[in-house]
Curated annotation (Swiss-Prot):
Family (UniProt): Belongs to the NurA family.
Top-level class of the enzyme under EC nomenclature: hydrolase
Subunit structure: Homodimer. Interacts with HerA.
Organism: Pyrococcus furiosus (strain ATCC 43587 / DSM 3638 / JCM 8422 / Vc1)
Cofactors named for this entry: Mn(2+)
Task of the protein: Involved in DNA double-strand break (DSB) repair. Probably acts with HerA to stimulate resection of the 5' strand and produce the long 3' single-strand that is required for RadA loading. Exhibits 5' endonuclease activity and both 5' and 3' exonuclease activities.
NCBIfam families in UniProt: NurA_Pyro
Protein name listed in UniProt: DNA double-strand break repair nuclease NurA
Pfam families per UniProt: NurA
Regulation of its function: Exonuclease activity is stimulated in the presence of HerA.
Gene Ontology terms: biological process: DNA repair
The keyword Transport is annotated on this UniProt entry: no
């Protein structure tokens, strides 16, 4: 099947040439090249690089997933792994998996840092810190679940739930650290899935009236659910028969939204709440790292491009400017003048106070730069909680060619191959069938005839 015609090539070429010409004709491009600095001299440092991987299989009644996080660097390799199953009709299953994978990476970054010695030590993470803070993996579903739980069990019990779970997390981290110190790996790093039943029995089963017999009515502020001011949600319409549109809009304006929640809704909200708290806790612990750096390979920011009024991503802009004015793709870096400040609205006030390191970072901001480690290579985004001029020499000590060797090793070492995932899944399915043949109804694979 032919996918590319001569006409398509001409059209694509014209689009890209027009963009390139817009950059070359812009009179402000010299301001950018004047900000492009040579790389500083490397400084000897100890370091760990962390990366994660996931494999997800959607079966007939279940989503089964495998997670892995690996730290490679100045000490022995450290690994966290996790296998779990969730309902396939769980509306945010993909986001839950991603959030738990990032939780593993953050946890491992924090614990690996504690094993490094010396003043000049750092942690390298793959991806961006701004992405984790500005748009968390399950946002806004996680925020909605938090507010549902808070309204359902009351502010006092919700506060007790948070404090109890955070105390469990502190104990859990000590346990994981002991296992890593002894064995270098651990296969039960996610706490939420092990305690959600116990906390449900304590805070919901014995306290929420009518929980066991049917749906529970709960009033929640409209803003907490993320509804637009003049929109009537379907669930509100369904629970408000006999009321006029004007009456419903008035109730919404007064922030009196009534929802009827079933047992599954409540359980999912609790699970989402605990997962999100565990995720935020992992970020908060990682932010204790003095020299923390994130390296992003793929990103689409337009911070510089907007200053020139051109519609291309910053990496393409930098490449075009450097090649036009210097004549080759010179190594170096460009630091963004102002730190990126995550918006506080991303986090409810009642939650942010529990995570002081996140709160401080929101006030302080995240330092950002574009870096090319070697002439002719690609440009990466560097984000750090530390000044760029301070963190860059530490990570340059571990440069190999156009990239950072520890991150490269972590990426290749953590990757879950298709073959490995299939063999592991088949072993799990066989174990389930041996335990009870009826369990096979949950693990049938609809695409198997196509493979």
């Amino acid at each position: 099947m032919r996918l590319l015609s001569k006409q398509s090539i001409e059209r694509i070429t014209k689009i890209l040439l027009d963009e390139l010409e817009n950059v070359r004709e812009n009179e402000q491009i010299r301001n950018i090249i004047n900000s492009w600095k040579p790389l500083p001299s490397p400084e000897k440092s100890s370091i760990y690089a962390v990366d994660g991987s996931r494999s997800v299989s959607r079966l007939s009644g279940t989503v089964i997933y495998f997670l892995s996080a690996l730290a490679v660097g100045s000490g022995k390799q450290l690994r966290l792994s996790y296998a779990n199953a969730i309902k396939s009709n769980y509306g945010t299953s993909d986001q839950i998996v991603r959030m738990q994978m990032e939780t593993l990476e953050n946890m491992l970054g924090y614990l690996a840092y504690r094993k490094l010695e010396g003043e000049k030590r750092a942690i390298l993470m793959d991806g961006t810190l701004t992405g984790s803070l500005v748009r968390p993996p399950v946002y806004p579903e996680d925020i909605r679940s938090l507010n549902v739980m808070r309204a359902l069990i009351g502010e006092s019990d919700f506060e007790n739930l948070l404090n109890e779970f955070l105390e469990k997390l502190r104990d859990h981290y000590r346990k994981v650290e002991e296992h890593l110190e002894k064995n270098g790996n651990y296969d039960s790093p996610i706490l939420t899935d092990n305690v959600v039943e116990k906390l449900r029995k304590k805070y919901i089963d014995t306290k929420v009236i009518a929980y066991g017999s049917g749906k529970v009515k709960v009033k929640i502020p409209r803003k907490a659910l993320g509804y637009s001011p003049r929109v009537i949600p379907i669930e509100v319409l369904e629970s408000s028969r006999g009321k006029s549109v004007d009456e419903l809009l008035q109730e919404l304006d007064e922030e009196k939204v009534e929802l009827y929640l079933g047992k599954d809704d409540i359980y999912d909200a609790l699970h989402m709440t605990l997962s999100y708290i565990e995720y935020l806790y992992s970020i908060d612990k990682l932010l204790e790292v003095k020299n923390l750096a994130y390296i992003a390979k793929s990103f689409y920011t337009k911070t510089l491009a907007r200053t020139l009024g051109v519609e291309i991503v910053d990496t393409a802009l930098l490449d075009a400017v450097i090649r036009t004015l210097i004549g080759h793709e010179k190594e170096g870096y460009l630091e963004i003048e102002h730190a990126v400040v995550p918006p506080k609205w991303s986090f409810p006030d009642f939650l942010l106070s529990k995570f002081r390191n996140i709160e401080k970072l929101i006030d302080k901001g995240i330092h950002l730069a574009y870096v090319r480690f070697e002439q002719g290579d690609v440009i990466y985004m560097l984000q750090s909680t530390t000044n760029i001029e301070k963190i860059l020499p530490l990570i340059l000590h571990h440069k190999a060619g156009g990239y950072l060797r520890p991150l490269q090793l972590a990426h290749h070492g953590v990757k879950i191959s298709y073959k490995e995932a299939r063999h592991t899944l088949e072993a799990l399915i066989n174990a389930l069938r041996n335990r009870d043949p009826a369990l096979k109804i949950f693990v049938k694979y609809g695409r198997s005839p196509l493979e």
